[in-house]
Design a protein with these regions (language model features):
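ASCE RecA-like P-loop NTPase motor cores
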Residues: 1-273
Length: 273
């Protein structure tokens, strides 16, 4: 364990063999705690079958830590309106965990690993950002939300929706766990707070808000890998590399028509060195 910790601190790749199913999870936990225990954990597996085992074992050691799978996208990429908003929100949550915005456990299958992602900087640039005290026109904000793919409704009761009444605008960003209530005083932002979607009660005051886009823009560049999203203290575990690469090779052959949307096996091997 000490040698593994030293290698991780030096950002080196380590290879372990001879661990059983339960032992893998135990070692992951021990390694994570020995490092600092404050970062997210990313577990990369060949299939979802392995995810079920890791999810069960890691939940025992981290019962309060949220878990999320980075679900693969449908290729060719299509507008999210024809996909599930819940899946889109789950992907956004997984990427937040990887980037260290929140601590959590992320599971990534070979299929998801192989797909190219939007560059983090580009996704950040397309967000709608609002700060307390900022002067903003409510109608312009609502138009921007429509441009980003959000649906206007009478009342917000699901992710990806927004609703307006008087000087109040409610929105449920796909990159947040709760909806947010934005309040105006004249043209200035006077209140930003999350609220419970069932009781409508306020939960947490915010200084700023960043709303991610739902719409897939034609100008977006998908050139990033999962590893480009990982923060410095995100612990990346690659389970059964031989089986993983066999599965990646299979997906690469099956997705030849979409070669521009996926990484080659050799490229992914290079990322892991």
């Amino acid at each position: 364990l000490k040698q593994a910790v030293n290698s991780c601190q030096k950002k080196e790749t380590i290879i372990l063999t001879g661990l059983g199913e339960v032992s893998k999870s135990v070692f992951c936990v021990a390694l994570n705690e020995a490092l600092d225990g404050k970062g997210s954990i990313c577990v990369i597996t060949a299939t979802r079958e392995e995810i079920r085992n890791y999810r069960r074992e890691l939940a025992y050691f981290y019962p309060d830590l949220p878990t999320q799978e980075l679900y693969p996208e449908t290729l060719p990429r299509i507008q999210v309106e024809t996909q599930s908003l819940e899946i889109t929100a789950a992907r956004a949550a997984a990427l937040r965990f990887l980037q260290g915005e929140e601590q959590g456990i992320v599971f990534v299958t070979a299929e998801a690993l192989e797909q190219k992602l939007l560059r983090p900087s580009q996704g950040e640039a397309q967000r709608l950002k609002i700060k307390m005290g900022q002067t903003l026109d409510q109608k312009e904000i609502m138009q921007k939300l429509l441009d980003l793919g959000y649906e206007r409704t009478e009342q917000v009761d699901a992710i990806g929706q927004f609703a307006s009444r008087g000087e109040i605008l409610d929105v449920y960003p796909i990159n947040m766990n709760d909806p947010v209530r934005i309040e105006w005083f004249d043209t200035d932002i006077d209140g930003l707070r999350t609220f419970d979607i069932d009781s409508q009660r306020s939960k947490e005051n915010l200084d700023a808000l960043s709303i991610a886009s739902i719409t897939v823009f034609s100008t977006e560049e998908y050139t990033a890998s999962v590893f480009d999203y990982c923060a410095e203290n995100t612990l990346v575990i690659v389970d059964e590399p031989v089986r993983l690469f066999d599965m990646l090779d299979k997906f690469e052959k099956e997705n030849k028509p979409y070669a521009e949307d996926i990484f080659t096996v050799e490229e992914l091997k290079g990322f892991m060195q």
